[in-house]
Amino acid sequence: YDLHFKMLNAKNFKVPQDRKRVFFIGFRKDLKIDFKFPEGFKEEIPLSKAIGDLTEKVLSAKNGKNANNGHCPIPNHEYMDGGYSSIFMSRNRVRSWDETSFTIQAGARHAPLHPQAPKMKFIEQNKREFVQGKEHLYRRLSVRECARIQTFPDDFIFHYDNISAGYKMIGNAVPVRLAYYLAKEIKDSLSGSFLFQDIESKQLEKTV
């Protein structure tokens, strides 16, 4: 196989999130594919555009961690409630409305905090606190907000009993838009090969 690899940041592919990942793309050597990774876009999408319309009708998970099962006015618009670890509180976890999100991780307890809250106050190295008097504004992003940031469409519904499973499914996914641009580049690279043309012609014959 001819192997191509490159680190890509999802924020360069119309994903409202800082998310750096290394992608490996392999092609059979006999295809002689000269693959080029997509270049991306200069414009970044801020949180205000991604989740600005989801500020209301959000629910806290039952008992802090269980799904509200059919009672969310907006599907999956529920967030994990509960304490924050010392590791979580070691740095700021809030991005402003005009910024892209932190990386959406697979763990519910590591979900970024909602941009309605002010950035966390620096106390000393590896220690931050919520701004006094504004504590009520700090909450984790909801499952739906994380899905939006991962660019899943709103009609893609996640099913789970424990809300941690919802965060895990979303956090482990490749952002939808980034996957699209990668897949498009792969398709365009393959379209010139005889193998791909032969497959397309056979598929076309089935429809005639």
Task: List where the protein language model places each region.
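Conserved S-adenosyl-L-methionine
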Residues: 1-12
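S-adenosyl-L-methionine-dependent DNA methyltransferase catalytic core
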Residues: 17, 21-208
